[in-house]
């Protein structure tokens, strides 16, 4: 017997311990003890003290006294009795005093209730932040509700449960006490109580309930109007919001009239509801009910009958009626409080399940914390399957069944590749301990993940997904998600490394610097790729080459003479002596060129027939177009190396170009190609500018600023060029971020505001912002890039991201795990490749090892159908093209 009682008491104790009110009070004890004490005092202690105080401090007793006084004053007035000034003053003062007490009590309850609701929402937020991914999905089984509705549903359920214990139960106890006291006092007057006076309020209450139900059943809930009351208004609101979200798709597909037709249909249904006959009946019924017509008629009849049978006056009748109504209202409160037990039980189960969700806070308190990374190992028996939360009938198939071991070492680069739905992202989520494996284990430094705290793993691993979430705010705020304490200099450096400033690069600036530094090495007959030829199309000195070999020497002589004469025309009117010297030098150059050409065998000129046809460009064209670029470039501070005495430099430039022409003619077509390749390499080398010039160039390209000076022609002097250059520098606004007292000011990109989800920016730019987060988080020793550059252009990845990323990883001893479908960009830059296929790790090794091992899945991902022995992937592509 004793054991049975002990077991029952233990079960009751555990039940109370697991009740939501107990969990919430324990939460307040750990987080906010002050609020816990206020809650207990306001809801339990103060009402008890007030009830035990004398009548002048008890709300209930003051209320009874005020009701009796009001009836007495009203009766004296109706019977034309003497006016009592003191009774009226006393009634007014007591009413004010009662209102003050009632509002103080209500104010305290509202303050504590608001604080409790806010703490409940914080509890939900804490559970959401520190719980397993998908832990809240049990609330979304029946209805696919959104995050806002989910939070409201959780908070309201918890608040209802907590309010039951903090408000309903204390109010129930107070109602029981008042009902007993008021009922006993009423029974003392039983000899003066007529049955009609007791039945009257009960019958009135029954009538009101029946009238309300009839109106709802017969009028408002008839088949014609049951669904028209509110759903169509909400449907209109949802339709407008959906239209605003998908406006671009609607306009592109010309769905405006279709949408308006649907909206007109909703309007017609809403109007049919408003204009229906049932609406008129309902409004008439409500108007009669609001006037209390039948209640008044019944009250007059009952009053005359009771006063006539009991031989009492109106004052005693009114007093007795108010006392009876007071007891009936207390009984109604008791009935409603007891009825709330049924509703609270459903919330109780849901809230208890929610509050029992474990959080990382409790977990981290007894798990190990890792401070360094030595090895990350994934067992070969690793399996994982997503729980089917929306259908218990369908089985859960494993997404991952690795079947091979994975080992990740420090300071290495890894690639994780596979087809879509091969399990790459799921494996990354397991490595970040966002999910827990169904079978098998992952270990770091020989310690299983189950024994390592999540915060420790997240400190070691930095992860960027393919679709990162962009938070509403500035770009700087979004970059600081990776490290909230990052300095503005670190954010600026990270943004530059992630290509945030490079999404609209200007090639004219690079070409301008290249022309300035390489003008002495250009040959007038050199073939220029089409990417450069548009810069020289404004000049009339471009001559197409021919394939004729018999007159090649004469053509070369004529071209040189024409080019030199045009050059003199472009730089004329400075002084006559310079013109004469130029003409003499031109003649000497032409003679030298003729002699050289006559002594050399003719070489057929290469004429491409493809769309990427090359054009010839001579020295004077380069110099003139260099001036044109300098005047029209809105990207940079101009380089003075291209200025100076143009006429004085023409002779040397002509000689150099003619000599270069001789060398090119000797080398033939192959020499021309090599020269073009050398030129392209020099241009790329010259494009590697300083960080500050890069920042100026990229920021300017973002703002689409144009040059203030007009485009220059060939008639202006060099002095005018320099003056225009100085004016442009003086009028150029300073938009480079200036460090003032350790802070960035007037930054046009980092201070740009983005919407939630990055709706107002491109996908590639959003990926650059998310990628910048890893550059401000140097404490991480493993960086996982899960298709985080899939929407970036190839130039940005090749020329900006990868060099900065690899340098950053090498500097901070970081291991890189790159998930990508662009195998050509990583196959020769990583140390090890993991190949997944349908959740299985089918191949692993370097690119050469996988090619030599005839890794079939890897071949398929490369787009190859069979193995070519003793050939690399690049050779395979070359042979295929041939």
Swiss-Prot record:
Bias-annotated ranges (Acidic residues): 715-724
Positions with biased composition (Low complexity): 528-617, 647-667
GO MF annotation terms: ATP binding; ATP hydrolysis activity; ATPase-coupled transmembrane transporter activity
GO cellular component: membrane
Location in or out of the cell: Membrane
Residue numbers spanned by region Disordered: 522-617, 634-669, 710-730
Parts of the chain that traverse the membrane: 4-24, 35-55, 79-101
Single biological process term from Gene Ontology: transmembrane transport
Domain of life: Eukaryota
Domain ABC transporter, first and last residues per copy: 384-863
Membrane topology: Multi-pass membrane protein
Residues involved in ATP binding: 418-425
Keywords annotated in UniProt: ATP-binding, Membrane, Nucleotide-binding, Transmembrane, Transmembrane helix, Transport
Family: Belongs to the ABC transporter superfamily. ABCH family.
Name this protein carries in UniProt: ABC transporter H family member 4
Gene source species: Dictyostelium discoideum (Social amoeba)
